[in-house]
């Protein structure tokens, strides 16, 4: 049970339309995200708005002839159905959270075998802090993937979220997605 009535997903209008007309398709999610391949939401409306704006700016920087607009999808939660799901919840950005994020994001098999991850969607839902995308995480992942460092060498506070970054709740199975329903678009 997550105890939240509404969740928000910040995106761009073309992807929002796809979700509105076809539903969430987990296969369209990118690999190597914080909590593994999944559909990412947040209980923080403002964080979702900022995410949508950031995604629109990034898309438009490379597609000036066909610009997109930010959109936020609002989902209602059926909290009674969450109890039947396999869940992992991180309250704070501590060492276990960092190892989980790094194991999901890097490509090294030995890291996947040594540390908990969600590459196989063993968790229906994962919640916790959003890793800071200020450019600190990508070099760390590169160092892990090339063997320049081990997870034990990583200072996880380097990519721990800033105070203003929101919590994320990710859905990794269709069973989990059945617990949320699209209500409106902002």
Q: What label would you give each PLM region?
A:
Residues 2-40, 46-57:
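Glycine-rich loop/turn
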Residues 1-3, 32-35, 49, 54-186:
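Conserved NAD+-utilizing ADP-ribose enzyme module
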């Amino acid at each position: 049970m997550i105890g939240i009535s509404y969740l928000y997903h910040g995106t761009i209008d073309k992807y929002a339309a796809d979700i509105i007309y076809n539903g969430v398709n987990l296969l369209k999610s990118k690999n190597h995200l914080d909590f593994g391949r999944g559909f990412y939401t947040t209980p923080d409306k403002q964080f979702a708005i900022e995410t949508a704006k950031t995604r629109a700016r990034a898309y438009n920087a490379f597609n000036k002839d066909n610009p997109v607009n930010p959109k936020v999808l609002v989902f209602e939660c059926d909290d009674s159905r969450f109890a039947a799901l396999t869940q992992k919840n991180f309250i704070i950005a501590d060492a276990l959270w960092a190892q989980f994020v790094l194991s999901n994001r890097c490509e090294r098999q030995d890291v996947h075998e040594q540390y908990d991850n969600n590459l196989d969607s063993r968790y229906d839902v994962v919640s916790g802090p959003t890793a800071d995308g200020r450019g600190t995480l990508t070099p760390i992942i590169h160092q892990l993937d090339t063997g320049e460092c081990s997870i034990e060498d990583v200072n996880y506070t380097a990519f721990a979220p800033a105070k203003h970054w929101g919590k994320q709740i990710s859905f990794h199975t269709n069973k989990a997605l059945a617990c949320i329903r699209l209500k409106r678009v902002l």
